[in-house]
Amino acid sequence: MKDLLKFLKAQHKTEEFDAIKIGLASPDQIRSWSFGEVKKPETINYRTFKPERDGLFCARIFGPVKDYECLCGKYKRLKHRGVICEKCGVEVTQTKVRRDRMGHIELASPVAHIWFLKSLPSRIGLLMDIPLRDIERVLYFESYVVTEPGMTDLERSQLLSEEEYLDKLEEFGDEFTAKMGAEAIKDLLASMDMQAEIEDMREELETTNSETKRKKVTKRLKLVEAFVQSGNNPEWMILTVLPVLPPDLRPLVPLDGGRFATSDLNDLYRRVINRNNRLKRLLDLAAPDIIVRNEKRMLQESVDALLDNGRRGRAITGSNKRPLKSLADMIKGKQGRFRQNLLGKRVDYSGRSVITVGPYLRLHQCGLPKKMALELFKPFIYSKLEGRGLATTIKAAKKMVEREEAIVWDILDDVIREHPVLLNRAPTLHRLGIQAFEPVLIEGKAIQLHPLVCAAYNADFDGDQMAVHVPLTLEAQLEARTLMMSTNNILSPASGDPIIVPSQDVVLGLYYMTREKINAKGEGMYLEGFAEAEKAYRTGVAELHARVKVRITEVLRDENGIETRETKLVDTTVGRAMLWQIVPEGLPYSIINQKLGKKQISNLLNEAYRTLGLKDTVVFADQIMYTGFAYAALSGASVGIDDMVIPDAKYTKVADAEEEVKQIQEQYQSGLVTAGERYNKVIDIWAATNEQVAKEMMDNLSSETVLNRDGEEEQQESFNSVYMMADSGARGSAAQIRQLAGMRGLMAKPDGSIIETPITANFREGLNVNQYFISTHGARKGLADTALKTANSGYLTRRLVDVAQDVVVHLDDCGTYEGVTMTPLIEGGDVKEPLHERVLGRVVAEDVLKPGTDEILLPRNTLLDEKQCQIVEENSVDQIKVRSVVSCEADFGCCANCYGRDLARGHMVNQGESVGVIAAQSIGEPGTQLTMRTFHIGGAASTAAADNSIQVKTTGSIKLHNAKHVTNGEGNLVITSRASELTVIDEHGRTKESYKLSYGTILTKKDGDAVNQGDKIASWDPHTMPIITEVQGQVQFVDMIDGVTITTQTDELTGLSSIVVLDAAERASAGKDMRPTVKLVDANGNDIMIPGTEMPAQYFLPGKAIVNLADGGNVGIGETLARIPQASSGTKDITGGLPRVADLFEARKPKEPAILAEHAGIVAFGKETKGKVRLLITRDDNGEVYEEMIHKHRQLNIFEGDKVERGDVISDGPETPHDILRLRGIHAVTEYITNEVQEVYRLQGVKINDKHIETIVRQMLRKCTITHSGDSTFLEGEQLEFANVTIANRQLEAEGKQPARFERDLLGITKASLATESFISAASFQETTRVLTEAAVSGKRDELRGLKENVIVGRLIPAGTGFAYHQERQKQKAVEQEGPSAEQATDNLAALLNAGFSSEE
């Protein structure tokens, strides 16, 4: 019988739903949920503690207080299950029904729901098209509203004040009706004809021309259509019945001393019931209108407070002056239902303790204290004890465990074997913050952690704590072992580099072991293999660092896994030969035959992983660690004060600098330099001195002179402990050593400006009081910053995760030919990242051809791994088009080919991988390392002088890209185009350097010329912008009248005169409309045409231009007609660090953005208005003229008659991503955001793969705006999900109809998260009330596609191992739609079984 009950219960699983819909509840629906009306405000009887009948905790309505027992105690026990007691009316059932049975309150007067009234934009107001202020006046009984105008001249929904109403009553009698309060609003809503409204509005949209009107109408139209489609009735926004929450969700707990702890909701409900009952009584008594009205208003206010306290007026407070927590407060915010209970739960079978080092552990192990293990694995131990017959009952087993009998420990050993546990360190910033280990039982009370995983956890042993969790089910154990085991997480998901990298002691040990020393004991010996080397070292015949010759055998594997053995004699040291014994077969000896620093060890592990695979690498990593620790101990490297050697040159250099500063001070006092110049010069002097002292000090520390075997002096690297620690990368850096032994240097104030007196002392000498005080100044700011940084970084991660959580790999291949074109990353002439590094792990979108031929190197859809990238490098391919997440055409999530390699595993990404969350974590996790500050240019920061020439750093040939140029008299090229670029290529055709060329740059080489390293190939004047002539001829001035449009200035020193054009604003009225121009004519005075065009060669001069020519003089091609002074642009603040990353992802518009050309065409200037310039572009494509107004103070980079391309920069400034998207397209904006974000991270030395940033950008581009609706149902100007539009368009095209046209939109991450399809996900992120209100009104349906929604409803997530389950369900759903539904089948079965059993019972 019991089994059958279980079976029937199991049939109605809650998981069997596919979507969640939210809507407005009708009064009937509320009554149908309810189990009875709550009539009294009483809660429980203070003497008996029994709930009062008909009160807020009534047992008759909500269910029994004790399991299977009615209130009066007449019926007890299971056998009366389902009986309703005739005395107290309580049903005999489980007490847990008190958690889900609801009640209701019949309101004596309708009440408006505050969410739909006050949550902006007010839904009620928008729907009725009445301002919110007016509606509130009606609701709170300040004015009347006309509900039925009848035959009068009044309008429907017109407001009347008390006096007006009385006047109209006298005038029209009962011809019309006007009411106040929620009833009036309810009547108005009830009498609205939705369909008619929709038709009116559609008509209005077609006829109106006003943009604001159109926007307003579209908004309202959307709302009305949503009401019609969702089947919501607008009058349901006014409540007539109020649901009452089940009592166990608003508990009342008696404390000792006769007091009660209660949920605030009970107070709020009591208020409502009291006022409602009073109102009913007043209505029965037919009390005067004014009293009833006041009571109705109070009822409205109390219901408002219950639903959302504090949204209107002052919040209702409890006895202790704090606002009561209303229903809305229960679900929103960090402590609300969503974030506290649904997205983050507490976990049983867990414990936490302090961590210590476990240097003897293997990589997959952790040390677990016995006491802890015993507690965590209790149930397993009980079952084992029972199973082996050592204990008869669970109770006996419990006793045995409590007594800690010897047998229990043996059993614990058994239980733990092969049962992984999860270790987690808070804050868990990326997925490596939780990993699985096999526990090893240890004495003591601290968890032991393997040192190599510290980097992933960001753990240290200064008191950090970690939590242990036990995976219970078999599936959980399987996942822990196969996916989360520390040995499976060797590579970082952010960059694909090893994250299991030795640091500190281990690095120092290996470094010490592989150093060489001149003339060490045993130098020049010949040794047979590492065994003999070890013997020589152990017996003291040879020192660790002695240079010797050793015979070694290398085993190398080629691509096909064929091994070749090679034995050879190599020059090496004893230490390196001994290290060779732990290196696995398959790696070359050369990889360890060098001094190993942190970088080299990282490469060693990376190489091992790529060539040997996971298993060997893990063993190797452990061996490296043990060896490193051992030799670090033997090295005896320690820091003493004498290790910090102060260079003698320091004192003389400091004295020289002080002398120089004194001179500048004197110059300043005699007025030769300004205060700003003096400050900058002083800071430059000290910065340079600091550098020199540091250099001297490092040279001093890093080398020492020793005698070699022949007794000659020789330089070798020093064995100074401090130097070794820094050089190996174990601890410290040159900058820190500089502070210890050089000079501390310049200090910054908290606002970022630099204090001009540096600290000349170092820590070895010690600081005096002044110096100490200056130090504390900046240091304190650093600490304050760190605290802020952590919070900001956490918030950025949260927003990123939220926006990207539903990007999961759904398909194998979406089949797109789109992609991004990758080129080497070049900055200021240096290759920052070569091409083969950037494309590693991507899939090729188009065949890669061998440069200069049609031979296909790599076919389309190849995943580029290390081997293929080498092919790319060898053939010096300079650009490759690769697939990208941004251009992926999958409707939901993305496809595997567009994503490419799973960085943490090194192979193609699997289906179901949640790449969005990984991307968010990879960008957010290093957030705490980024700086918080905005760099102010000043002092040391701006020392870089303005560049005025290009010197090439490599030998090769030069290549010009989209450059127009003319040849001047000297035979040099002069650039006449705006956005040209010059690159230097080596003999293999690889781009080595790249420079931007500005207009007017003079080149000494031509396209394709060979250059040598150090050649100066280009020069320009950084302070002015020239106007270059493209033809030769005679100068003729037009509209250049001295004193009106120009002034002549004579330089006092040289006596040369120059003409300066006046700004239009400064001219007299006569010169306002004149346009100073330089024209070129031939000898006969005829206009010269610009070659290849019909345009005369005339050059308009902007204000402030300087002309050095005389009227009638001759000029040659490529000469400068005029110069325009450039305001130096180096004084803007650079926003750096975290705030910059946040700005980029939020797609914020900068203050003064760059102005870009909206169309390709020819530029002209129109009439100027006050403060603005009118820019005209005659379009190439259709000859139309586009005009734009630009502020006068903006400096324009173009002249009249210039040709611009769409998206060209017209005025400099930071570019807005929105403009880039609109004018240059989706790939340009992706590249912009990627590069800008990478720049910030690169500064901090953090490596993140581009594809993570692209994944976020894809989510920012989720929405699009309809520009033309075609045959679709979309409205013009409507913002929709991109996927939905593409799906709809596909369908329209299939039916031969016209698809909708649209423009992609770029949304910031916060906006994008709130604009997701899923209202559950959006509500749990931010602005819960607004999201839910909107969703309810439009009757939204959540398809539960993302991860967050599924976590909230308590299912497996549709990613990772849960992906298969969801795929299966979707398949089943498709099958079910054909046959009868599964639920019907179960119901039929249940009915049959019921019929069979009930008779017997």
Swiss-Prot record:
Keywords: DNA-directed RNA polymerase, Magnesium, Metal-binding, Nucleotidyltransferase, Transcription, Transferase, Zinc
Database matches in Gene3D superfamilies: 1.10.132.30, 1.10.150.390, 1.10.1790.20, 1.10.40.90, 2.40.40.20, 2.40.50.100, RNA polymerase II, clamp domain, RNA polymerase Rpb1, domain 3
Cofactor annotation remark: Binds 1 Mg(2+) ion per subunit. Binds 2 Zn(2+) ions per subunit.
The protein's required cofactors: Mg(2+); Zn(2+)
Catalytic activity field: RNA(n) + a ribonucleoside 5'-triphosphate = RNA(n+1) + diphosphate
A biological process from GO: DNA-templated transcription
Spans traversing the lipid bilayer: none
PANTHER family cross-referenced by the UniProt entry: DNA-DIRECTED RNA POLYMERASE (PTHR19376), DNA-DIRECTED RNA POLYMERASE SUBUNIT BETA (PTHR19376:SF54)
Subunit description: The RNAP catalytic core consists of 2 alpha, 1 beta, 1 beta' and 1 omega subunit. When a sigma factor is associated with the core the holoenzyme is formed, which can initiate transcription.
Similarity comment text for this entry: Belongs to the RNA polymerase beta' chain family.
Protein name: DNA-directed RNA polymerase subunit beta'
Organism the protein comes from: Aliivibrio fischeri (strain ATCC 700601 / ES114) (Vibrio fischeri)
Source taxonomy: Bacteria, Pseudomonadati, Pseudomonadota, Gammaproteobacteria, Vibrionales
